[in-house]
């Protein structure tokens, strides 16, 4: 199984707060609600490549 490193970027301020290892077989980008320390609140984080 091939894995790749990806980052989760805040959709509000754009800062990359979290890093993940994800399967290359997934076609859609991951979107999660996570806490952004720069915004100080829960925001939507999207996977960057």
Curated annotation (Swiss-Prot):
Database matches in SUPFAM superfamilies: Zn-binding ribosomal proteins
Gene Ontology CC: cytoplasm; ribonucleoprotein complex; ribosome
Cited InterPro entries: Ribosomal_bL33, Ribosomal_bL33_sf, Ribosomal_zn-bd
Highest taxon listed in the record's lineage: Bacteria
Keyword match Ribonucleoprotein: yes
GO molecular function, one term: structural constituent of ribosome
Biological processes annotated in GO: translation
UniProt entry keywords in alphabetical sequence: Ribonucleoprotein, Ribosomal protein
Cited HAMAP family: Ribosomal_bL33
Membership in a protein family: Belongs to the bacterial ribosomal protein bL33 family.
Protein name: Large ribosomal subunit protein bL33B
Organism phylogeny: Bacteria, Bacillati, Bacillota, Bacilli, Lactobacillales
Gene: rpmG2
């Amino acid at each position: 199984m091939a894995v790749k490193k990806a980052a989760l970027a805040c959709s509000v301020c754009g800062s990359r707060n979290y890093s993940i290892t994800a399967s290359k077989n997934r076609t859609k980008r991951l979107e999660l609600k996570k806490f952004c320390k720069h915004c100080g609140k829960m925001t939507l984080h999207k996977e960057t490549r």
